[in-house]
């Protein structure tokens, strides 16, 4: 797997520097996993595109995050390999929207006060965190979890 090139003046932009280091950690975590050559080639294409960017500006930061998301989506879809707390973060939002809002709506309608609509959000969030944490634990037990967390 290809490596990110060393950038001398990236330390001037703190956000870009942190994102670049995080992408490097993701690539290091992926090297431990045995990935097919097809997947490695796709990841290498993403890295080559990022290495070809010479200027460090706001578009560079956007490109780093885009490449990181592309790599995470690729390995999740093809191999079901996910970073730590991937499902917890995903299901927390799903729980709030799929369970929390309808529960709050029912609660608000039963009391007759739509101001209570927001009361379902923390309930849905708790349900989502519970479901996501159990899925993360299952992924860890099956060896499908990377030693890397998206921040």
Predicted regions and their residues:
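Helix-termini ("caps") and immediately adjacent flexible loops/tails
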Residues: 1-101, 109-115, 133-151
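Hydrophobic alpha-helical transmembrane segments
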Residues: 112-125
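Alpha-helical transmembrane segments and their membrane-interface exit regions
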Residues: 124-132
